[in-house]
UniProtKB/Swiss-Prot annotation:
Homotetramer. Interacts with C1QBP; the interaction is indicative for a C1q:C1QBP:CD209 signaling complex. Interacts with ICAM2 and ICAM3 by binding to mannose-like carbohydrates. Interacts (via C-type lectin domain) with CEACAM1 (via Lewis X moieties); this interaction is regulated by the glycosylation pattern of CEACAM1 on cell types and regulates contact between dendritic cells and neutrophils. Residues 1-37 are cytoplasmic. It comes from Hylobates lar (Lar gibbon). Keywords: Adaptive immunity, Calcium, Cell adhesion, Disulfide bond, Endocytosis, Glycoprotein, Immunity, Innate immunity, Lectin, Mannose-binding, Membrane, Metal-binding, Receptor, Repeat, Signal-anchor, Transmembrane, Transmembrane helix. Glycans are attached at residue 80. SUPFAM superfamilies: C-type lectin-like. This is CD209 antigen. GO terms for cellular component: membrane. The lineage of its organism: Eukaryota, Metazoa, Chordata, Craniata, Vertebrata.
Amino acid sequence: MSDSKEPSVQQLGLLEEEQLRGLGFRQTRGYKSLAGCLGHGALVLQLLSFTLLAGLLIQVSKFPSSISQEQSKQDAIYQNLTQLKAAVGEFSEKSKLQEIYQELTQLKAAVGELPEKSKQQEIYQELTRLKAAVGELPEKSKQQEIYQELTRLKAAVGELPEKSKQQEIYQELTRLKAAVGELPEKSKQQEIYQELTRLKAAVGELPEKSKQQEIYQELTRLKAAVGELPEKSKQQEIYQELTRLKAAVGELPEKSKQQEIYQELTRLKAAVGELPEKSKQQEIYQELTQLKAAVERLCRPCPWEWTFFQGNCYFMSNSQRDWHDSVTACQEVGAQLVVIKSAEEQNFLQLQSSRSNRFAWMGLSDLNQEGTWQWVDGSPLSPSFKQYWNRGEPNNVGEEDCAEFSGNGWNDDKCNLAKFWICKKSAASCSRDEEQFLSPAPATPNPPPV
């Protein structure tokens, strides 16, 4: 069987070779038949077609994206060109630019002459307030008027003298402001004059000794108040300055805040204009000097700043010390840390302490023996005085061995704590003739020391 098939195949191969030669084809090396050649050629063509199709699809998919990006880029460039064109269109001519440059140069030079940083901050705050005020300005016509006024002011500032002169002007304005702030109001001046009249009558009637101390203290305060009045030339200067300020404020637009400032300046002007003339001030000062001299010659049972009560003098300190130093402080002025002898004295001292809202040491402790309270003069605490302890006191919490005035009663506390203190000593007796104290005091050119 195999032998019969092989000649058939050979015959078929010869037949195909003859047909190809008749058609003008040559047999290609590597291919045994036309059918094999045609079969491989179709596969190659399909592969090439698929590759070309895939490349075309990729290029087509990229084409719209590149077009949109290019379009957005062109739009951005166009917008930038439009903005640049508008900005260039807003520039003024070259001469205007030069004018702006020169103005900036002048401003830079002016800034270089500004004073220290603290002054710059004050100027900046003032400019901020001015900016807020300008924001409230009325219609355009008024703004133009203000602009013209500012132009004139700028020209005036350009004519100012050197920097030292400007500082002198600023200092003078500062002193003027301080002087105006110290002027007493009219009602205060009348009160001073009326008080002088009452004091003169009171000294002539020679009231009780405790009243004399009150009169002396009032005279001291009045003297200080009169001493703050400026001299007549200074008053005229203040009056002129206020007049100019009033005129300047009167030119401002009608705003509620500006009206309030104008009214305040009017009241200040009226108050300064009504100040007593210099001769009247001198008369008041001389009267005060005479009254003070007369009071100083009066018999005083207690030193100044001490309070008289039932034949004794009491001093409430203005500083604080511990209990032991308070005892020493009273001894240095010939007194002792207060020892209470009666219910009336206790009520008087408790009232003085509560009014001043101070915790003050008294001369009572149990340092010698715990629980046994003694005064600094060695006398024991009376059982009737135990009612003055606050509720729950004395409790000796943390070695509390010294007594103080606290609120409406007594309290024990640590002796090393700093508190106010109260001294007590006997009042002096006045044996001189009362007529001696009513003699008029000679006028003295210089006031006595306070």
